Amino acid sequence: MPDVYGPGASQNDPIPAHAPRQQVLPEEYQRASDDELHRRIREAKDTLGDKVVILGHFYQRDEVIQHADFVGDSFQLARAAKTRPEAEAIVFCGVHFMAETADLLSTDEQSVILPNLAAGCSMADMADLDSVEDCWEQLTSIYGDDTLIPVTYMNSSAALKGFVGEHGGIVCTSSNARSVLEWAFERGQRVLFFPDQHLGRNTAKAMGIGIDQMPLWNPNKPLGGNTVSELENAKVLLWHGFCSVHKRFTVEQINKARAEYPDVHVIVHPESPMPVVDAADSSGSTDFIVKAIQAAPAGSTFAIGTEINLVQRLAAQYPQHTIFCLDPVICPCSTMYRIHPGYLAWALEELVAGNVINQISVSESVAAPARVALERMLSVVPAAPVTPSSSKDA
């Protein structure tokens, strides 16, 4: 039985064979107390000074976030690293595809480090290059000269970003997906969207595209499990991928929140299933959720459909509001949770000793077209800035 990503929503998502594996954390870090680990992290940071920058994703545990120089979403953080050209090492407290993106945007003189190589992303691993290339061949054999534009979500491997770059496509984030799809439809008749079906479906529906024009592509079936006529009728072809955390949210949870808190404002991430997004008051990226709470009048009540670490941090930072997670069962991103303070201390102390461990490096043959896809996205909608942060500014 293969190892699994973690508890809760992730329990049925086996780690694909190609996902990275992490060596055992040295025993001294396993045995160290929390206080000792935090002391060692601080001391290593002080020793390294400007030679290192630590990036912390919104979904990281607080014990890690407190040491981050920047806190934000994956693309904000990758771009934030560019503001520290003097940093020889970029330590990305996130997951594998995020570190890859940081490597794409960093200089040749900088090393990108992922403290725990086992911090992958089940959704990103649901679309691999071989399967996407096979899908592409099947679709282009049907569509002929009709232009098909590939769009990959930021939550994908560098190899897939390179694929879309080579095929006239583009990368999107959860905050700019609509603008990116509009860009794609200015250039082609159809879009192949991967790996997250829910973000693609929710975005296309908001643009007025019918559900019958959004067939799901299952890479394990001929023609993705569709008929030729269904594919010919398609406008957006959705890859059979999903986020293990966000698929947990349900309309029943929203109804329960409204029954208990009549004035509640329900915000969900667009990686949630379509019925959940439809039933919510608003949906948006992690940055959207943070800003909505920051701007709300005191005494507001929010039920939030996203990862629990972010929700709990917001509840602690904004005690003037009532903030809770839609899912009553704790729903962490279990792979993000693999970045334990012990791994961060280990990575930093190895840097102090002159050793670079767990380096994430994208080959130039992949990086060059992947950068093209990212640059196309930036030409459509520039990335929102992220400011330097203490642990408070997540």
Curated annotation (Swiss-Prot):
Family annotation (InterPro entries): NadA (IPR003473), NadA_sf (IPR036094), Quinolinate_synth_A_type3 (IPR023515)
Molecular function GO labels: 4 iron, 4 sulfur cluster binding; metal ion binding; quinolinate synthetase A activity
Keyword 4Fe-4S appears in the UniProt entry: yes
Entries under Pfam families matching the protein: NadA
GO cellular component, one term: cytosol
Signal peptide range: none
Gene Ontology process terms (BP): 'de novo' NAD biosynthetic process from L-aspartate
Binding residues for [4Fe-4S] cluster: C121, C243, C333
Substrates-to-products reaction catalysed: iminosuccinate + dihydroxyacetone phosphate = quinolinate + phosphate + 2 H2O + H(+)
Location within or outside the cell: Cytoplasm
Domain of life: Bacteria
Cofactor(s), by name: [4Fe-4S] cluster
Record keywords: 4Fe-4S, Cytoplasm, Iron, Iron-sulfur, Metal-binding, Pyridine nucleotide biosynthesis, Transferase
Record note on cofactor: Binds 1 [4Fe-4S] cluster per subunit.
Primary enzyme class: transferase
Role summary: Catalyzes the condensation of iminoaspartate with dihydroxyacetone phosphate to form quinolinate.
Record PANTHER family: QUINOLINATE SYNTHASE, CHLOROPLASTIC (PTHR30573:SF0), QUINOLINATE SYNTHETASE A (PTHR30573)
HAMAP family for this protein: NadA_type3
Full protein name: Quinolinate synthase
Organismal lineage: Bacteria, Bacillati, Actinomycetota, Actinomycetes, Mycobacteriales
Gene that this sequence comes from: nadA
